[in-house]
Amino acid sequence: MREIHIRGDMIRLGQLLKLADIAGGGGDIKAILEDGVLVNGQPEARRGRQLHDGDQVDAVGETLRVVAQG
């Protein structure tokens, strides 16, 4: 599991995928979401889904955990 540190208390799913270098842009994000992404074990298809401290994202064989910094 890889921790992704964010500023503030929220990040959107699409932004997280870019920050983690899983997606390069909008087209990549769309393809990844179509292949299947889990947020806290539940399927998610919305790139705008809000993620908060402790949320877990499973995408393209990687597991990410959101860690909020202040």
Model feature map: region roles:
Residues M1-I11:
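A detector for short, charged/polar N-terminal pre-domain segments
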Residues R2, E62-L64:
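Short beta-strand segments
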Residues I11-H52:
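A basic, amphipathic helix-loop patch mediating RNA/tRNA/ribosome contacts
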Residues L64-G70:
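Short, Lys/Arg- and Gly-enriched loop/turn segments at beta-strand edges
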